[in-house]
């Protein structure tokens, strides 16, 4: 299934249209929610507010990673300059990512998805797995083992956040430290500088769990992982609002549509899915309702 076989040229043009206003709103909303959550922890320190942040911040961290991903595709803003600068300095570096190496590795994922050459296969090809194996992965994520492993990999230059691609830049860690210095300074100006540790603790624990769930939701236990048809090798999760807020921000749950037309901005993906349904292109494609169903599918019976 190819875009020009299903959609008219006018429909494709409309879907591919980028909006700087929508892009900036997504970026600003993410950071406003981040600062608001950290302010709440500082204003009312306690177990409940810390737990609230531990649950809410991973979605904001993933939101930044998704926006980096969009910028890497050149589909977030209208201009390459904005995609490169905002994608790197405002979205990637705060989450210890690197736009350039990520985009390089992600291009290969799109090119080879549905084949043995997909570089991201190790993230999901083993599923379904036993319940005990899944719980072991969760323990590593939630106790910080996965996050600390990522930090070691970043320091050695062997990978970047959300990608196995070598970043190859001796300045990347320095840039990440610089951006986090600015982040700490901004928090300190509000009198809540110590909440940076809440951000980092969340990043190293619950965020790792959310990233794993995203990977499983997108490609694990699909109809046919080795078929080039995106309807078979990739999944969209039709999730309720609360799950999208906590686990799948910025329409990242519309992953099948993203693979179908990678240039469509994330804010246009729901419209793309609606059009595909109207045209019957998704007839017979299994509907996955929520990430609870994803987790059930990920466990071997």
Predicted regions and their residues:
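Non-catalytic, topology-defining segments of multipass membrane proteins
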Residues: 1-57, 67, 92-197, 201, ...
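Active-site-flanking alpha-helical
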Residues: 37, 72, 76-77, 226, ...
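Transmembrane alpha-helical segments that form the membrane-embedded catalytic/substrate-channel core
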Residues: 58-68, 100, 146-151, 199-228
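Histidine-centered catalytic micro-motifs
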Residues: 64-73, 102-114, 214-221, 248-264
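Aspartate-rich (DDxxD/NDxxD/DxxxD) Mg2+/diphosphate-binding motifs
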Residues: 67-86, 117-124
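Membrane-cytosol interface motif
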Residues: 84, 88-89, 226-237
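Cytosolic juxtamembrane regulatory segments of multi-pass membrane proteins
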Residues: 232-251
């Amino acid at each position: 299934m190819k875009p020009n076989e299903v959609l008219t040229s006018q429909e494709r043009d409309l879907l591919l249209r980028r909006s700087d206003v929508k892009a900036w709103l997504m970026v600003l909303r993410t950071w406003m929610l981040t600062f608001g959550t950290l302010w709440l922890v500082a204003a009312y320190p306690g177990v409940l507010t810390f737990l609230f942040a531990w649950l809410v911040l991973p979605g904001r961290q993933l939101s930044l990673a998704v926006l980096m991903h969009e910028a890497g595709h050149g589909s977030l803003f209208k201009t390459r300059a904005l995609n490169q600068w905002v994608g790197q300095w405002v979205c990637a570096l705060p989450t210890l990512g690197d736009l350039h190496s990520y985009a390089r590795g992600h291009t290969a994922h799109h090119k080879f998805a549905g084949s043995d050459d997909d570089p991201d296969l190790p993230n999901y090809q083993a599923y379904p797995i036993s319940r005990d194996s899944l719980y072991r992965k969760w323990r590593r994520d939630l106790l910080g083992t996965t996050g600390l492993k990522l930090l070691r990999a970043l320091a050695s230059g062997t990978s970047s956040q959300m990608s196995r691609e070598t970043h190859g830049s001796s300045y990347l860690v320095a840039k990440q430290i610089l951006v986090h210095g600015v982040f700490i300074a901004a928090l300190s100006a509000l009198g809540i500088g110590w909440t940076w540790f809440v951000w980092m603790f969340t990043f190293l624990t619950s965020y790792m769990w959310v990233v794993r769930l995203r990977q499983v939701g997108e490609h694990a236990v699909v109809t046919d992982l080795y078929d080039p048809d995106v309807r078979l090798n990739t999944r969209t999760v039709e999730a309720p609002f609360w799950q999208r807020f906590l686990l799948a921000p910025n329409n990242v749950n519309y992953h099948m549509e993203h693979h179908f037309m990678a240039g469509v901005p994330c804010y246009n993906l729901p419209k793309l899915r609606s059009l595909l349904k109207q045209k019957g292109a998704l007839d017979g494609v299994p509907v996955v309702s929520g990430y609870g169903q994803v987790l059930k599918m990920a466990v071997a019976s």
